Amino acid sequence: MAIRSFRPYTPGTRTRVVTDFSEVTGRKPERSLVVSKHRRKGRNNRGVITCRHRGGGHKRQYRVVDFRRNKHGVPAKVAAIHYDPHRNARLALLFYTDGEKRYILAPAGVTVGQTVISGPDAPIEDGNAMPLSSVPLGSSVHCVELYAGRGGQMVRTAGASAQVMAKEGDYVALKLPSTEVRLVRRECYATLGEVGNSEIRNTSLGKAGRRRWLGRRPQVRGSVMNPCDHPHGGGEGRAPIGRSGPVTPWGKPALGLKTRKRNKPSNKFVLRKRRKTSKRSRGGRDS
């Protein structure tokens, strides 16, 4: 997989950088694993906007992804690598020996024709799923369960991986992509290797229209709104915000405010908090 840039023959292609999709082998998704999905466009059940800047975009069909990997001891062959419009990672289509078909997140380096398997006795190879108790120290894993049997909930984005740091008692210490070190039960499953399509962080949309295709609407600055719409609004011309720091449309501090509850029960499983990162250091398709 590589990235592709374009000659500046239009303003939209001058800064456009995309992945070349060379690893994608399947043209159409598996019909038995595709379901329709109602797009809420940032609204809740009452029609009230709860997430701004959402709406429009190209129609999508949801691919049912197997995050549990609960077919233990049954080998599966990678039949194809498919594109998924709902995530940056690619999907690997698995054909199990008993005839069942499933999608999983495509790990980096896994190719068509390769065999993967899940279970406590699975070999140490990328793409195989096993309990954290069976993963060697220092190994990279992704699609990690927080609770046994619930399915992978952490480390699922393109290019992400967590590192197994230590094992003690019933818990395994994982270093997450955010640099946070967290304890997870040793019976929780994880997939070896990192998620593929890591080059997505080096891409650039190039124009506003491509962002609209993804279902992202324009973000209007609060300083150009009226005072009834945003605390930064109002004034004559380009007026300052008139506060000690920027705030959200609801008047709460916008930058650096901790949103995690201080007395959250799972705080005892966090051995080391993540380091602070700036917005400029974050990459990805939406940058």
From Swiss-Prot:
List compositional bias (Basic residues) regions by residue number.
258-287
| GO MF | rRNA binding; structural constituent of ribosome; transferase activity
Superkingdom classification of source: Bacteria
Residue ranges, annotated region (Disordered): 221-287
| Coiled-coil intervals, chain numbering | none
For whether the record's keyword set contains Acyltransferase, the answer is no
Which Pfam families does the UniProt entry name for this protein? Ribosomal_L2 (PF00181), Ribosomal_L2_C (PF03947)
* Gene3D superfamilies per the UniProt record, alphabetical: 2.30.30.30, Nucleic acid-binding proteins (2.40.50.140), Ribosomal protein L2, domain 3 (4.10.950.10)
Q: What are its GO biological-process terms?
A: translation
- Quote the InterPro entries the UniProt record gives: NA-bd_OB-fold, Rib_uL2_dom2, Ribosomal_uL2, Ribosomal_uL2_bac/org-type, Ribosomal_uL2_C, Ribosomal_uL2_CS, Ribosomal_uL2_dom3, Ribosomal_uL2_RNA-bd_dom
A Gene Ontology term for the protein's cellular component: large ribosomal subunit
**Keyword annotations for this protein?**
Ribonucleoprotein, Ribosomal protein, RNA-binding, rRNA-binding
Question: Which protein family is named in the record?
Answer: Belongs to the universal ribosomal protein uL2 family.
Fill in the subunit field for this protein. Answer: Part of the 50S ribosomal subunit. Forms a bridge to the 30S subunit in the 70S ribosome.
Protein function: One of the primary rRNA binding proteins. Required for association of the 30S and 50S subunits to form the 70S ribosome, for tRNA binding and peptide bond formation. It has been suggested to have peptidyltransferase activity; this is somewhat controversial. Makes several contacts with the 16S rRNA in the 70S ribosome.
The protein in question is named Large ribosomal subunit protein uL2
